Amino acid sequence: MSVLPTPLANQLLIALPALSDPTFSRSVALICQHDENGAMGVLVNRPSEYTLGEVLSQMGIDTDDEPLREQIVLSGGPVHPERGFVIHDDAREWDSSLEVGQGVFLTTSRDILEAMAAGNGPRNVLVALGCAGWGAGQLEFELGENSWLTAPSDANVLFATALEDRWQTAAGRIGVDLFRLTDYSGHA
């Protein structure tokens, strides 16, 4: 029987420079669930081609809040790209919500979007279409292959850092400069 390392929920998964898969290259994912069956996360630094206004309109939700309508929706990953995932810091009871950890929540129900459209939503929020998933042992294998770094989740990285800066900023929080890393080793 293998022992699962410390679960990675509420950790940021930071792609190392050698990770060349275009979906995950230079990505940062918030790990939302992690257990012996696998892991689920949402990429938090990949813009999609959609604005929140377009998504709300497709769902029949109206809002006059122009900054909300212009908010970029993230591409959260290749799994369930038709589903919405809302990462936020609002502990209210939503229809389908999970506490990722330390005041960070993942909600997948329509009620949070309706509250946002009405001006009653979370103060800090990321909306994504799709998520990332890893089968049993897959993420642990990828970590062992040096594809990823992990760092504690950080509200500043999630909600206050520009999308294009999240990759380097997340790594910098643990003292790593990703531009100084190489993907090969030398021998003496």
From Swiss-Prot:
Q: Which Gene3D superfamilies match?
A: VC0467-like (3.40.1740.10)
Q: Which InterPro entries match?
A: AlgH-like (IPR003774)
Q: Which domain of life is it from?
A: Bacteria
Q: Which GO terms describe its cellular component?
A: cytosol
Q: Which residues form the signal peptide?
A: none
Protein family according to the UniProt entry: Belongs to the UPF0301 (AlgH) family.
Tell me which NCBIfam families the record gives: PRK00228.1-1
Q: What's this protein's name?
A: UPF0301 protein XOO1425
- Organism from which the protein derives: Xanthomonas oryzae pv. oryzae (strain KACC10331 / KXO85)
Q: What is the lineage of its organism?
A: Bacteria, Pseudomonadati, Pseudomonadota, Gammaproteobacteria, Lysobacterales
